[in-house]
Curated annotation (Swiss-Prot):
Source organism of the structure: Stenotrophomonas maltophilia (strain R551-3)
Active site per database record: E126 (proton donor)
Disulfide bonds: none
A single GO BP: isopentenyl diphosphate biosynthetic process, methylerythritol 4-phosphate pathway
Keywords: 4Fe-4S, Iron, Iron-sulfur, Isoprene biosynthesis, Metal-binding, Oxidoreductase
Coiled-coil ranges (or none): none
rRNA processing keyword on record: no
Protein name: 4-hydroxy-3-methylbut-2-enyl diphosphate reductase
Catalytic activity: isopentenyl diphosphate + 2 oxidized [2Fe-2S]-[ferredoxin] + H2O = (2E)-4-hydroxy-3-methylbut-2-enyl diphosphate + 2 reduced [2Fe-2S]-[ferredoxin] + 2 H(+); dimethylallyl diphosphate + 2 oxidized [2Fe-2S]-[ferredoxin] + H2O = (2E)-4-hydroxy-3-methylbut-2-enyl diphosphate + 2 reduced [2Fe-2S]-[ferredoxin] + 2 H(+)
Entry EC number(s): 1.17.7.4
Amino acid sequence: MDVLLANPRGFCAGVDRAIEIVKRAIETLGAPIYVRHEVVHNRFVVDDLKQRGAIFVEELDEVPDNNTVIFSAHGVSQAVRQEAERRGLKVFDATCPLVTKVHFEVARHCRAGRDVVLIGHAGHPEVEGTMGQWNREAGTGQIYLVEDVEQVATLQIKQPENFAYTTQTTLSVDDTRGIIDALRERFPAMQGPKNDDICYATQNRQDAVRDLAKRCDLVLVVGSPNSSNSNRLSELARREGVESYLIDGAHEIDPAWVVGKQHIGVTAGASAPQVLVDGVLARLAELGANGVGELDGEPESMVFALPKELRLRLVD
C-alpha cells in the first residue's frame, strides 16, 4: 500500500494572511483579541489561536467596548462594519482579498441598479457577508441567492434584461458551471464577472483531487466539517468514483478504510495546516503504508499583504 499526495493542498494565501493577522495582533497588542466567527474553518487552527489569546465570537455585541476585533477570512456585511464603527471598536480585516473582490462586484451592481444572483450555500458566513453588501437605499435592484440548478428553473427576477451573477469563492467548479449555464439559458442577457469568482486555490485543489482520484482507490481529505472547500474536495473524489472521507485529522481514520487498498490519496482543504497532513501520513504508515509520493501540480506563489499597522509593528 502506498500513499500519493495531491499538489497543491492545504493553506492558500487568504488563509495564511488571516491566521497571521490574528497571531500578529495578539503579539503586538496583547491578549485578548476578539475574532468575529472562526477566522478560518479549521478546528486545529482555531484551538491553537485560542491558546494564544484569541476569543472567538459570533456577534459584535459579545465584544466589550474599547477592544480589538478581527473579521474572519469569510468577510462580513456592511451592517457589521457599521456597527463596529459606531461602537468605536478597533478593527483588523482578515477578509480574503478574493472575497473582497466579490463584495466590490455586488456593491457596483447595486449602485448601477442591477439585479444580482449570488450562487452559493445559504447560511455560509461568506454568503451572508456578500449578501450584506447589498444596499437597498443605493439602487433599485434586488439580490437573490441560488444554491442549485433546480432553483434556477423557478427563479423570478424583476429585471431579466439587467442583472448579473457572482459566486461564493469556495464552490465546486463543476456544479457552479452547471448553474451558470442554466441561468444563461433562461436569461441570455445575464452579465458575469470578467474573471471567475471561484478562487485560484479552490480551482487548483479541485483539479489536483481530480488527478488524484484517477490514480487511487481511496482519497482522504484533511479538513473540518464546516469547511466548504474541504467538503467539495471529498465530494469531487466520490463523484470521480473513488471512496473518499473528510477527516479532521489522523485520529478519525478508520483502519477498515484501508483494508485491500493499494493506492491511498491524501489532500487537504485550503484551511487545513500541513501538520495535520503529516499526522495522517504517520498514521497510514502505522497501518501499513510503505511509501509516499507527490503529484506534480500547479505552482502557487500568491501572497496577500497584511494590514499596514501590523506590517509596521513587525518592523518596529
